[in-house]
């Protein structure tokens, strides 16, 4: 018999060492050096000497905080007792203004090393540090409902959440009680909560048809909590109240309609400030044709329509294109051309840009807008490009493309969309030279 020998994989060895933390990175991790290694330690702050269990890979080591030898004067007690277990908030041990300071410092360092120059840094957009989330997505598994644990798919059951809007946070204890009474646990995918005054909504994502008794319990819970109840297996169904509920939010003197499963920005206050700043920076006029790429349900499209001659809104999801069109019609705006288009398709993007634009607004998801930025850089392109990003890594890549193509980065600012977390959101304005 032939024997096949396989080389055993070497397990990575970890060792506890002392590390002096000098900065935070764009993931909110403490950064320091030890024995020639660059060390990343979640939960550590600049100025602290910590002990960490380090696992090295090349010249970099990832660490797990074991203790603090010296504690930063900036460290504060977290408001939430789930911190350290729940993966939702990474920075509650640091005051919100200092969170922004270190996020901006980390971004400046990244851009400096990439050779990207910023004309002017603008003050960050700020809002409430807690109680700001108007949407929540709760995981459900084996009868547990909550948020994912740090670095794991395990669920931490929660009865409160400091960053959730109080209208959503108040529902958590009753949801835990409700879940314990349901028989069809394995049919529950996850739960999405949404608060858009005056309405609160709950959408249960299902993998199969719920037992009749379970659905009756969901309806009874919704009635007792005054929550609009929806389920989705394939199509979305509203179960309570009987009359259709009109979900939406005001913005820039407009009313934007929203479906229970639609993507919206989680932070209403920052969203309002973000749109106002975008309009001020891009400054569209009644003689201009403007592109709104990754347009969603019209969060930027409709404010642009109020100011520009014409707006072409491009989105990859047909349902969002339809929502954008409906929102424009409901607000009496007739200068919107909403299209469904794959912005990762170079040919489609080339054809789109060939029609000509004076200005463009880009608001992509985390993968960024590489194909679109390549096309903008390669052609004559609009004179102004405003880029809203939720991922500095892909934004940095795309910014380099625009700069290489003749654009200048004239101003940049952070937006505190996700206070208490490591997430970094930014807005940047590029102007074509010459």
What are these regions (language model features)?
Residues 53-55, 139, 431:
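Residue-level recognition of conserved beta-strand edge/terminus positions
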Residues 1-82, 152, 165, 338:
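Terminal RNA-binding accessory module
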Residues 122-129, 190-193, 234-238, 413-417:
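Short, solvent-exposed loop/turn elements at beta->coil junctions and helix N-caps
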């Amino acid at each position: 018999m032939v024997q096949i020998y396989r080389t055993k994989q070497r397990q990575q060895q970890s060792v506890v060492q002392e590390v002096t933390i000098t900065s935070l990175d764009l993931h909110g991790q403490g950064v320091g050096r030890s024995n020639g290694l660059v060390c990343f330690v979640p939960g550590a702050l600049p100025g602290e000497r910590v002990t960490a269990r380090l696992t090295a890979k090349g010249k970099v080591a990832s660490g797990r905080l074991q203790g603090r030898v010296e504690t930063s004067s900036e460290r504060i007690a977290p408001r939430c007792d789930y911190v350290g277990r729940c993966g939702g908030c990474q920075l509650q041990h640091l005051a919100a203004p200092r969170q922004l300071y270190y996020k901006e410092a980390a971004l400046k360092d990244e851009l400096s090393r990439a050779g990207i120059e910023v004309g002017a840094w603008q003050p960050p957009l700020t809002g409430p540090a807690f109680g700001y989330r108007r949407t929540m997505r709760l995981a459900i598994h084996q009868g547990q409902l909550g948020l994912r644990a740090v670095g794991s798919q395990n669920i931490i059951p929660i009865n409160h959440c400091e960053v959730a809007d109080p209208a959503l946070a108040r529902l958590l204890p009753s949801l835990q009680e409700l879940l314990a009474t349901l028989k069809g646990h394995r049919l529950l995918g996850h739960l999405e909560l949404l608060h858009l005054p005056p309405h609160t909504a709950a959408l249960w994502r299902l993998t199969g048809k719920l037992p009749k008794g379970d659905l009756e319990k969901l309806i009874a819970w919704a009635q007792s909590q005054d929550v609009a109840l929806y389920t989705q297996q394939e199509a979305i169904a509203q179960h309570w109240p009987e009359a259709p509920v009109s979900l939406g939010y005001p913005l820039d003197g407009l009313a934007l309609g929203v479906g229970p499963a639609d993507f919206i920005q989680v932070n209403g206050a920052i969203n309002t400030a973000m749109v106002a700043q975008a309009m001020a920076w891009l400054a569209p006029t009644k003689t201009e044709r403007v592109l709104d790429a990754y347009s969603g349900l019209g969060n930027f499209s409709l404010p642009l329509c109020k100011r520009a001659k014409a707006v072409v809104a491009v989105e990859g999801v047909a349902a969002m294109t339809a929502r954008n069109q409906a929102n424009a019609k409901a607000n009496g705006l007739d200068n919107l051309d909403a299209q469904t288009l794959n912005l990762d398709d170079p040919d489609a993007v080339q054809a789109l840009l060939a029609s000509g634009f004076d200005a463009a607004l880009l608001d992509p998801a985390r993968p960024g807008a590489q194909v679109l930025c390549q096309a903008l850089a390669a052609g004559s392109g609009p004179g102004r490009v405003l880029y809203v990003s939720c991922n500095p890594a892909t934004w940095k890549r795309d910014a380099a493309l625009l700069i290489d193509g003749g654009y200048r980065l004239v101003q940049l600012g952070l937006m505190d969309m996700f206070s208490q977390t490591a997430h970094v959101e930014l807005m940047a304005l590029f102007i074509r030279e010459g």
